[in-house]
């Protein structure tokens, strides 16, 4: 083992904000808090390069030295998120242009165009300097590129560089303007183009063609992916440590595409008491992106906030929140931030120690987490979450399509996936990987693709068909296979592939509001659907459930078809939560997949397997008492006690149980 080993517990540290002599005190306090890693330099460009070409890295070397002497590792960041004033003054064209045509001012963050060549060149230079200085330093365990890259104001940059690149990308994709017009169907509203130069950058105030909007979002995503890749290429030539970029729980940027050039997933979140469970969803999504354990690079100790503090967290929240990434396959949890700022835009954000250096009220929880990471470290490092055999598709392209074509009033794709699909599975302890459509299907016995408009995404349709024929069970729908990648409808049927694959025909469809329609199983039990209703006529398929009222009465709501060695289950509507639990548990059991535990819905139980043995990490997520029934006696590495049978779980309790 090396000098610095996971699991890592740390915080973002900004020594450039404070007098140099304060570093010793901060390091002493970090040791007392039990931290073993700090993130440095993500907003420090003006301190690293006070004027163009004049590099001053000595202060950063001294901080890394002092941290290392205290056995605290460093995650080194490239500071490109916050360009210095000399840059934005001299190279004004590097500043982002918003959808109103207004160029950003100095003083924000991520307010620069990711395609601007001058900005990219200057980012490359500071990245190279850092890489050559720290790229083989054993005290640096990894690299973070930039900070929370995302689209400016949700729409991206509208500068001349971006406009040229957008149109050139369309020209390369379609080769001729006639092919673009044909693919998008631009005859609607007389939108036909005679040249690529006529294609506008869509602005939010205009009711634009959905295909144009989807193309613009794909372009903006690709611009940011390429921006990060260019820094990653520099780092990979000079550093030995893993390289990542910290991302938020959003789908406007494709995690799958972003990480093609990276080594580790770095993930930030700030969910609180009411929605901590949603982080289980997101971590089940970031875990399969790469085989290496992910890093939770930012979360709050007690509350987040900029100029206001956004919500008190109850005692125990910091403990449960800190353990979630470790339980779910990560190897690091870092807080934002170490010491609260004394000036600037985020004065009210939670921290580990206050502005004046006094430990916050959660200090004991931080120390408890540190002690737990140490006590269970061998088990954590020697195991991984057990492969679930079950996958659920989540798509950035689906997010884009539903953003501009919500299908239903106020429909929110991510919320529907979390509340209507994932939460019932989580409460039933049916563990799953949440995967991008481009992800391999090997190792999964059941794949659920709800609300997945375009099966062409990531070449899914070919791989999926072969996987089904080879023995996989695919659960499709509702609102799956209803669009092309360009956001248009199939013209020969409501679905592009599904009718042929599944042996069904969709007679007609109804929206899922304002009323719910009943569905009946063969045993006479009635339940209600949600979101959408497709009335299916079985051909070679078998009707498993039929609508029992309304215009769809007598048509199938759920069908099943054998395809090769596998099968397709089509959902014409999304069962409400309790019925979805029953349906998915039944299908999973038929494929040899069973709940991870017998436990109350508020208790997360993650099976772990590996050279260090078998066991579970248990986290209570709702600040309520719960219960867990153990299948065999187990030893809790956190309190050094043996448990068997039914165990009462306390609010926000964590257990690391080795069998």
What is the predicted role of each segment?
Residues 1-22, 27-37, 390:
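An acidic-aromatic substrate-binding cleft motif
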Residues 11, 30, 38, 67, ...:
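Conserved, mostly hydrophobic/aromatic
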Residues 17-32, 123-129, 247-258, 279, ...:
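Short, acidic/polar
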Residues 100-264, 276-282:
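Polysaccharide-binding and catalytic clefts of secreted carbohydrate-active enzymes
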Residues 196-199, 237, 270-659:
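Carbohydrate-binding surfaces of carbohydrate-active enzymes
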């Amino acid at each position: 083992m090396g000098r610095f080993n996971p699991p890592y517990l740390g915080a973002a540290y900004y020594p450039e904000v404070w007098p140099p002599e304060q570093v010793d005190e901060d390091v002493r306090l970090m040791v007392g808090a039990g931290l073993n890693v700090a993130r440095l330099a993500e907003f420090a460009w003006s301190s690293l390069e006070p004027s163009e070409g004049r590099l001053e890295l000595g202060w950063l070397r001294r901080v890394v030295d002092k941290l290392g002497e205290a056995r605290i590792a460093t995650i080194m960041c490239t500071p490109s998120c916050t360009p210095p004033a000399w840059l934005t003054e001299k190279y004004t064209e590097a500043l982002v242009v918003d959808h109103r045509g207004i160029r950003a001012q100095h003083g924000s963050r991520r307010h620069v165009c990711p395609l601007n060549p001058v900005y990219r060149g200057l980012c490359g230079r500071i990245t190279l300097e850092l890489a050559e200085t720290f790229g083989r330093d054993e005290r640096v365990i990894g690299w973070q590129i930039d900070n929370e890259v995302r689209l400016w104001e949700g729409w991206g940059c509208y500068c001349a560089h971006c406009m040229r690149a957008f149109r050139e990308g369309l020209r390369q994709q379609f080769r001729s303007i006639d092919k673009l017009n044909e693919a998008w169907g631009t005859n609607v509203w007389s939108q036909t183009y005679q040249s690529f130069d006529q294609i506008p950058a869509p602005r939010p105030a205009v009711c634009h063609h959905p295909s144009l909007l989807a193309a613009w979002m794909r372009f903006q995503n690709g611009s940011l992916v390429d921006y990060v890749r260019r820094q990653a290429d520099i780092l990979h030539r000079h550093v030995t440590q893993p390289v990542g970029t910290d991302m938020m729980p959003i789908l406007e940027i494709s995690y799958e595409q972003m990480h093609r050039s990276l080594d580790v997933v770095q993930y930030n979140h700030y969910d609180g008491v009411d929605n901590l469970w949603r982080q289980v969803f997101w971590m089940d999504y970031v875990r399969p992106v790469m085989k290496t354990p992910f890093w939770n690079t930012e979360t709050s100790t007690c509350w987040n906030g900029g100029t206001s503090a956004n919500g008190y967290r109850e005692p125990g929240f910091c403990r449960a929140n800190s353990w979630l990434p470790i339980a779910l396959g990560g190897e690091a949890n870092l807080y934002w931030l170490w010491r609260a700022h004394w000036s600037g835009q985020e004065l009210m954000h939670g921290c580990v120690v206050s502005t004046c250096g006094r430990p916050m009220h959660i200090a004991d929880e931080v120390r408890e987490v540190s002690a737990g990471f140490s006590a269970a470290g061998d088990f954590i490092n020697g195991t991984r979450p057990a492969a679930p055999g079950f996958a659920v598709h989540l798509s950035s392209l689906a997010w884009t399509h539903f953003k501009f074509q919500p299908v239903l009033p106020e429909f929110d794709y991510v919320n529907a996936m979390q509340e209507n699909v994932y939460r019932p599975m989580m409460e039933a302890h049916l563990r799953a990987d949440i995967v991008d459509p481009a992800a391999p299907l090997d190792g999964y016995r059941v794949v659920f693709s709800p609300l997945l408009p375009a099966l062409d995404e990531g070449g899914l349709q070919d791989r999926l068909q072969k996987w089904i024929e080879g023995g996989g069970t695919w659960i499709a729908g509702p609102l799956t296979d209803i669009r092309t990648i360009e956001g248009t409808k199939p013209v020969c049927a409501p679905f592009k592939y599904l009718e042929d694959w599944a042996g069904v025909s969709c007679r007609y469809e109804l929206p899922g509001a304002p009323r719910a329609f009943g569905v009946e199983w063969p045993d006479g039990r009635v339940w209600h659907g949600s979101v959408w209703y497709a009335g299916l006529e079985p051909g070679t398929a078998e009707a498993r459930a039929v609508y029992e009222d309304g215009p769809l009465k007598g048509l199938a709501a759920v069908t099943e078809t054998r395809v090769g060695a596998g099968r397709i289950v089509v959902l014409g509507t999304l069962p409400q939560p309790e019925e979805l639990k029953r349906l998915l548990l039944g299908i999973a059991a038929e494929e040899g997949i069973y709940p991870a535990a017998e436990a109350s819905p508020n208790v997360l139980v993650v099976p772990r397997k590996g050279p260090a043995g078998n066991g579970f990490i248990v986290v209570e997520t709702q600040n309520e008492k719960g219960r867990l029934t153990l299948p065999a006696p187990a030893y809790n590495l956190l309190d050094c006690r043996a448990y068997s049978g039914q165990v009462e779980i306390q609010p926000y309790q964590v257990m690391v149980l080795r069998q």
